[in-house]
């Protein structure tokens, strides 16, 4: 049949509403009236079946701490995933009940009943979920994109800690219609859940008059687990009711402990788990036609269509080690980065990784600081990755050849990470990175880190690293980094203190370190009061933080800090998913005269520019943010701030040159027109007015619109429009208003810059499962000579692309 035959067959089966190539069965209910069309069908019949079998099933009540579940084994279940839970095979499943709320009120019985059936077969683990609801009209359910419903829909989340190590767990999340969300829970990471990895599994859900029901089937070959004849897995099930923000779990949770996974239940005595030797082959075919503006002639022209072939491969070396490889990868379906305001930024901006190959196994590379930043591999020709866990040691290695276009040649990148378990929840790790460009330059970093959990409540993070950067036959530049932080987990009194020291010579070219040559000390204390169950104010409280930055030599010489910030914040959350916070801070900056070397006033006799130090003392700022998580058909977030801020002379190394009053605001609004159609509107604006005379130094305005229509779980169309207008003026002396010159070989003024860009993107996508896709997309880059001069826009570049890939699991 061939590659395209398989692709078309899969598309036909999915559109017909039956099991496709991957065996997925979806409810045949799509479009604007999805929820309404399935009301009244399912939950009543499911509850009748439950009543008749309750005496036969083994029930494990989480509220009674019945958290150890012996293997609920069934060899050959005949279960068709349709969200009904009416097959007799479910009678053999263990039943998880007795959910308790952990947010906003901890320890009380859940407001709505949840019952989860668990089955383990020779090929998969299955979950049958009955989420009862006394207000079925209040159930939030949309045909959202994968991983995209966490802030809009009700959901049930299953955590599987397959190594039972309390450090990492698979996350499988479903909304009432069976739409999938998946990722990896990483204890101690900044985001807690990494939603980027996608796994192959099946799900189906239905809404009825008493709530909703969902069936899930997770193949064992989609999981990594120990190579052991008998093993235990950590198990947790959570449920969120979106209309009120109530969250409950099967195994009771408390915020008084540092580790969430350590509070999970357990699937005990799992035997005969044989995933088989996993082999995924994922060929990719792309075609594109690109256009651009010729810088010499000013004419716009398009090139002839071109095509390309790439290949992705995943091979299960063992049940716990995986090899991933890619050749000529294509990331054309990846959404472009949202525009960021850059008119007064001192440091490089961080952009999250979005490319599929680099997302798998990224949890192993999580560290207190980003010594591994895979976006530093800009355009790989090919790459390979090994990741997994052997005993109590997690390992990961990425090797890549980057097509950088640099004059020093294409760099070869190697990233190695090893992390070992210590005790119940602690870890120690090592990282090594090497970026070598054809023998012309090199950068190497060696580091170690530890996360130590003390008395179940306190977490100590420590990290030390050294770097070597240079070229052959030249002196190597050495650098060091050290940090330590201590935090206290609590639902009421929270504490955190940290220390970080980075030498000026530290370079991590495969990582992302925002500042070097500094020493930072900061501390934070906060207290939270919580209302009774059902109270109007669910939680509220203040927090106080203090930060100080020193030039590294000045810190060790006992001198005053270069920058300080004292901040007092107040936050509150109200019934119905409404919240906000208010922050008042006071900043000070002290820069020695030597940092202003090379800056002069533009006068007949150029004189050195040395602003008065007191200009940058006691600058204040006031920030306000509020949000409504989901209110009927909308979700909204608002923010505003008014502050005094330095104007930084970027050519002078980021030194403050003037003071401005900064006015900023942003709004993000998501509208749920139907269960299939959503629209997002965002607007960000920042204006800096010179404090001396109120004249404008800079302004930036970025409106963004996105619309998405989900025809089915697999088929969607998306459109994005974003306009970015940013202007920056020249640096002026804060007293006289004289222009400031930057002089090295010659003297030049920073007379400002401006950009007014418009970006349009359109994408039609068909993605029945991760790796099997058809994308047809178009993008256009335009600009205009004046702000919002939409009648004067000219096209700078455009591109039309088609991508097709199929994931063969052998």
Where are these regions (language model features)?
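Bacterial N-terminal signal peptides
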Residues: 2-16
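Residue-level marker for the onset of beta-strands and adjacent loop->beta junctions
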Residues: 112-114, 201, 309-311, 382, ...
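Outer-envelope beta-barrel architecture signal
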Residues: 123-125, 168, 212, 229-233, ...
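Surface-exposed extracellular loop regions of Gram-negative outer-membrane beta-barrel proteins
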Residues: 274-324, 413-469, 539-546, 635-639, ...
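Catalytic-domain carbohydrate-binding cleft regions of carbohydrate-active enzymes
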Residues: 300-304, 322, 329-562, 567, ...
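Exposed, low-structure sequence patches enriched in small/polar residues
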Residues: 379, 465-810
């Amino acid at each position: 049949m061939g590659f395209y035959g398989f692709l078309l067959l899969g598309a036909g089966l999915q559109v017909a509403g039956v099991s496709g190539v991957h065996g997925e069965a979806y409810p045949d209910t799509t479009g604007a009236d999805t929820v309404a069309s399935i009301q009244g069908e399912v939950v009543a019949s499911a509850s009748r079946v439950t009543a008749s079998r309750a005496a036969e099933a083994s029930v494990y009540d989480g509220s009674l701490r019945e958290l150890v579940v012996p293997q609920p084994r069934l060899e050959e279940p005949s279960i068709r995933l349709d969200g009904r839970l009416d097959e007799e095979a479910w009678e053999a499943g263990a039943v998880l009940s007795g959910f308790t709320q952990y947010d906003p009120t901890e320890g009380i019985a859940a407001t709505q009943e949840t019952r989860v059936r668990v089955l383990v077969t020779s090929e998969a683990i299955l979950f049958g979920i009955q989420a009862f609801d006394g207000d079925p009209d209040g159930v939030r359910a949309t045909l959202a994109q994968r991983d995209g419903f966490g802030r809009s829909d009700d959901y049930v989340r299953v955590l599987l800690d397959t190594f039972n190590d309390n450090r990492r767990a698979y996350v499988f999340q479903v909304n009432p219609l069976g739409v999938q969300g998946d990722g990896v829970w990483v204890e101690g990471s900044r985001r807690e859940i990494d939603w980027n990895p996608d796994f192959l599994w099946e799900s189906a859900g239905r809404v009825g008059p008493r709530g909703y029901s969902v069936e899930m089937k997770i193949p064992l070959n989609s999981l990594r687990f120990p190579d052991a004849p008998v093993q235990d897995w950590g198990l947790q099930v959570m449920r969120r009711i979106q209309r009120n923000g109530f969250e409950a779990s099967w195994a009771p949770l408390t915020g008084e402990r540092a580790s969430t996974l350590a509070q999970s239940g357990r699937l005990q005595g799992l035997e005969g788990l044989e995933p088989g030797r996993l082999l995924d082959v994922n060929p990719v075919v792309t075609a594109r036609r690109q256009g651009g503006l010729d810088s010499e002639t000013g004419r716009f022209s398009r090139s002839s269509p071109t095509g390309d072939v790439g290949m992705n491969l995943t091979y299960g070396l063992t049940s716990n080690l995986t090899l991933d490889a890619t050749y000529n990868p294509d990331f054309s379906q990846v959404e472009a980065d949202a525009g960021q305001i850059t008119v007064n930024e001192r440091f490089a901006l961080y952009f999250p990784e979005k490319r599929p190959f680099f997302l798998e196994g990224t949890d192993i590379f999580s560290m207190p600081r980003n010594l591994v930043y895979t976006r530093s591999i800009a355009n790989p020709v090919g790459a390979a990755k090994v990741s997994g866990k052997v005993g109590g040691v997690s390992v990961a290695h990425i090797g890549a050849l980057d097509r950088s276009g640099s004059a020093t040649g294409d760099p070869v990148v190697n990233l190695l990470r090893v992390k070992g378990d210590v005790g119940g929840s602690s870890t120690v790790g090592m990282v090594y990175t090497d970026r070598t460009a054809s023998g012309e330059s090199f950068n190497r970093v060696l580091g170690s880190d530890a996360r130590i959990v003390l008395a179940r409540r306190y977490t100590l993070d420590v990290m030390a690293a050294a770097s070597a950067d240079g070229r052959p036959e030249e002196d190597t530049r050495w650098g060091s980094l050290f940090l330590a932080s201590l935090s206290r987990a609590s639902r009421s009194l929270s504490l955190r203190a940290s220390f970080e020291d980075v030498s000026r010579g530290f370079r991590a070219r495969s990582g992302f370190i925002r500042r070097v040559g500094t020493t930072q000390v900061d501390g934070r204390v906060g207290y939270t009061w919580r209302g009774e169950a059902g109270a109007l104010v669910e939680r509220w409280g203040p927090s106080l933080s203090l930060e100080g930055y020193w030039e590294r030599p000045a810190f060790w010489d006992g001198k005053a800090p270069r920058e300080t910030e004292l901040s007092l914040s107040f936050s509150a959350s109200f019934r119905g998913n409404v919240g906000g916070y208010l922050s008042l801070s006071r900043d000070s900056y002290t820069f020695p005269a030597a940092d202003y070397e090379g800056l002069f006033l533009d006068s007949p006799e150029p004189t050195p520019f040395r602003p008065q130090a007191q200009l940058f003392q006691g600058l204040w700022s006031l920030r306000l943010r509020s949000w409504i998580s989901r209110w009927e058909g909308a979700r909204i977030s608002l923010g505003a701030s008014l502050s005094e801020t330095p104007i930084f002379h970027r050519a002078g190394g980021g030194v403050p040159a003037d003071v401005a009053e900064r006015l900023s605001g942003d709004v993000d609004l998501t509208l749920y027109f139907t269960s299939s159609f959503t629209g997002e509107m965002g607007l960000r604006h920042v204006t800096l007015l010179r404090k001396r005379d109120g004249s404008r130094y800079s302004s930036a305005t970025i409106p963004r619109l996105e619309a998405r229509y989900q025809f089915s779980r697999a088929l969607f169309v998306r459109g994005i429009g974003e306009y970015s207008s940013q202007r920056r003026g020249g640096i002026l002396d804060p007293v006289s208003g004289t222009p400031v010159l930057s002089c090295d070989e010659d003297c030049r003024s920073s007379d400002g810059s401006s950009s007014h860009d418009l970006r349009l993107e359109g994408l039609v996508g068909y993605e029945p499962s991760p790796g099997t896709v058809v994308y047809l997309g178009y993008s256009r880059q335009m600009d205009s000579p004046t702000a919002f001069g939409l009648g004067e826009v000219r096209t700078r570049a455009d591109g039309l692309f088609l991508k097709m890939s199929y994931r063969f699991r052998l």
